[in-house]
């Protein structure tokens, strides 16, 4: 409970914002348009994925399973959080009036963490899958690859949900954020707030860093095979180039959208003197920066499906005609196998 002398739940902090200021900041039309575009983009990507998964190889089916999990996560994230935010912007209700017990705030905090961290963890899982598929093509049974991919997606969801539930167990707190239309982790100086903020930002940052490292090795391996001595006979298949292009696009989008928010959270909870006063108040500058970084991060849910839609072979062939003229039945796996045998 914040020392504000009221009987409100622990999710309410002093924000000192007027109704007129909320109307200027919280536009229901912008929020609704943002959600509609995002939901339509993810539905389009899911429909394209449904067609692409028919008749594909085991390796490609495994990768498409991860993509399906990623797009589904983005779609559900926009649907759940968008419903709450658009409703608040349209009605301009006072959060403490409709949710004095903080149940809705805690729910939104959990889903914000869950749907924020899941795409980053899925990106790292996809990078690991492609790294093993390119550098160790025969290290895992192909028949079980799709089943294992779904199991990995489920494990990622479970890990993200477990992290999101920590504030309900006393590690960190979820509070209503400026301008009073959403809930997120608390950027306070208490040990639980600091630990939870650092854990979220570090897991997200490590996921992006791992994706960058593994994707760099995978691309370097593909380039080595492409320009090797046997390049004329054994080049990467179109599907392998397509998957790496999509994965690199997902990594770039995640880095641009999420790293600013993750760095801001870590810097704010470690700030000395603390950014939050003992009464639970942040400076208006800090509150606005958090809102801006959060809005940038939410663009990840719109851009992810378009990475898959635009980086398909049908589009890549228009940009690089050589993809449609060279043999498509050859793979880089024989050359990688030959190299490993020589070692």
From Swiss-Prot:
Spans within the Extracellular topological domain: 1-29, 88-106, 173-193, 271-289
TM region positions: 30-52, 67-87, 107-128, 150-172, 194-219, 247-270, 290-311
Residues modified to Phosphoserine: 329, 331
Disulphide bridges, residue numbers: 105-183
Membrane topology category: Multi-pass membrane protein
SUPFAM superfamilies listed in its UniProt record: Family A G protein-coupled receptor-like (SSF81321)
UniProt xrefs under InterPro entries: GPCR_Rhodpsn, GPCR_Rhodpsn_7TM, Prostanoid_rcpt, Thbox_rcpt
Functional description taken from the UniProt entry: Receptor for thromboxane A2 (TXA2), a potent stimulator of platelet aggregation. The activity of this receptor is mediated by a G-protein that activates a phosphatidylinositol-calcium second messenger system. In the kidney, the binding of TXA2 to glomerular TP receptors causes intense vasoconstriction. Activates phospholipase C.
Name of the protein: Thromboxane A2 receptor
UniProt organism field: Homo sapiens (Human)
Gene expressing this chain: TBXA2R
